[in-house]
């Protein structure tokens, strides 16, 4: 399906432009394979290791593109966002590279390792309550006080274009891929991947992986409109956001299916990433593998014929204490 910028917030041209813009700063992450996981799944799996990206997650691509897209006057005043996780660290790092300030509104209770990354990369942490209304209210106040530019974690064409560069690289690295499995939360990652991949290879299938405790995307696809959940409950802290008005049209039109996973399936997949692939992956990053190994995927007619599957390991920022507790609880 042809994707154009008149219909969506990004397109293959903006994604290619983003790749040219950010290429000097990002890692071209490797694609790993495992005969053991191929045997378990009955398919050929290709793991795009964004857990090895700068900042420990795919988010650096979009944040870097957004920062580098600012003109000199905008950049001088800095950037602001509200985020509990990897976007916060990614934007801090992108701003540091450009030598501009980054104001990061972080909700109380955010994972310590992700807050530590913000501080490590020079972001100015401003605490909020854990509610979205508090995050947005404080971010708005910072905007008024500083004149900085808001960089939304996912509902932004520059962010979507940056994340889409993952698919450009993956399809250059492994041409025979017939499906890509992508974690879904706010939809910035899967929107970029879908727009790029389906422009390059229209027959490719894009499958979203989502926790059952935060299954707003699955519900939205069924309802044909954005469904927002009042409460989410999942170990995958990076997959609790709701779809945005820029990401929803792409998810609605270009994402072929959504596979929802139990917590135990996510934890087991994370263990496999450590024990078999030998890479550090957070729960949100491991959910793509969980999807491919699930009965839901195996029995889904839209997934059954997918033999060469790309899986985006989206991030690797996890508190070691929480990781250990998760592994112990799964025994």
Swiss-Prot record:
Optimum pH is 8.5 for racemization and 9.5 for dehydration. CDD domains: Thr-dehyd. One of its GO terms (biological process) is D-serine metabolic process. The active site is at residues 59, 84. Ca(2+) 2 binds at residues 210, 214, 216. Mg(2+) 2 binds at residues 210, 214, 216. It catalyses: L-serine = D-serine; L-serine = pyruvate + NH4(+); D-serine = pyruvate + NH4(+). Mn(2+) binds at residues 210, 214, 216. Coiled coil: none annotated. Keywords: Allosteric enzyme, ATP-binding, Calcium, Isomerase, Lyase, Magnesium, Manganese, Metal-binding, Nucleotide-binding, Pyridoxal phosphate. InterPro entries: Ser/Thr_deHydtase_PyrdxlP-BS, TrpB-like_PALP, TrpB-like_PALP_sf. Inhibited by hydroxylamine. Racemase activity is enhanced by Ca(2+), Mg(2+), Mn(2+), and is decreased by Ni(2+), Zn(2+). Hydratase activity is enhanced by Ca(2+), Mg(2+), Mn(2+), Cu(2+), Fe(2+), Ni(2+). Its EC number is 5.1.1.18, 4.3.1.18, 4.3.1.17. Mg(2+) 1 binds at residue 178. Ca(2+) 1 binds at residue 81. The modification N6-(pyridoxal phosphate)lysine is found at residue 59. Homodimer. Belongs to the serine/threonine dehydratase family. This is Serine racemase. It comes from Arabidopsis thaliana.
């Amino acid at each position: 399906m042809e994707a154009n910028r008149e219909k969506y917030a990004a397109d293959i041209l903006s994604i290619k432009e983003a790749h040219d813009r950010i290429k000097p700063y990002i890692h071209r992450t490797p694609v790993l394979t495992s005969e053991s996981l191929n045997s378990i799944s009955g398919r050929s799996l290709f793991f795009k290791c964004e857990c090895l990206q700068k900042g420990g997650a795919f988010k650096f691509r979009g944040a870097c593109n957004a920062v580098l897209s600012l003109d000199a006057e905008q950049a001088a005043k800095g950037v602001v966002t509200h985020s509990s996780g990897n976007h916060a660290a990614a934007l801090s790092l992108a701003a540091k590279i450009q030598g501009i300030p980054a104001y990061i509104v972080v909700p109380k209770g955010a994972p310590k390792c992700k807050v530590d990354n913000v501080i490590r990369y020079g972001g100015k942490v401003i605490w909020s309550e854990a509610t979205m209304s508090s995050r947005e209210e404080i971010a708005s106040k910072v905007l008024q006080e500083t004149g900085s530019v808001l960089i939304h974690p996912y509902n932004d064409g520059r962010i979507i274009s940056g994340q889409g560069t993952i698919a450009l690289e993956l399809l250059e690295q492994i041409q025979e891929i017939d499906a890509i499995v992508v974690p879904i939360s706010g939809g910035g990652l899967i929107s970029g991947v879908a727009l790029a991949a389906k422009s390059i290879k229209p027959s490719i299938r894009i499958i979203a992986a989502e926790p059952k405790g935060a299954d707003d995307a699955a519900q939205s696809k069924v309802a044909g409109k954005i469904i927002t959940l009042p409460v989410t409950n999942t170990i995958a802290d990076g997959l609790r956001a709701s779809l945005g008005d820029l990401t929803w049209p792409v998810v609605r039109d270009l994402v072929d299916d959504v596979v929802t996973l139990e917590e135990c399936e996510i934890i087991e997949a994370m263990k496999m990433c450590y024990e078999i692939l030998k890479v550090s992956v957070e729960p949100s990053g491991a959910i793509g593998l969980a999807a491919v190994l699930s009965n839901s995927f195996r029995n889904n007619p839209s997934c059954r014929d997918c033999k060469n599957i790309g899986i985006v390991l989206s991030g690797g920022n996890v508190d070691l204490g929480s990781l250990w507790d998760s592994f112990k609880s799964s025994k």
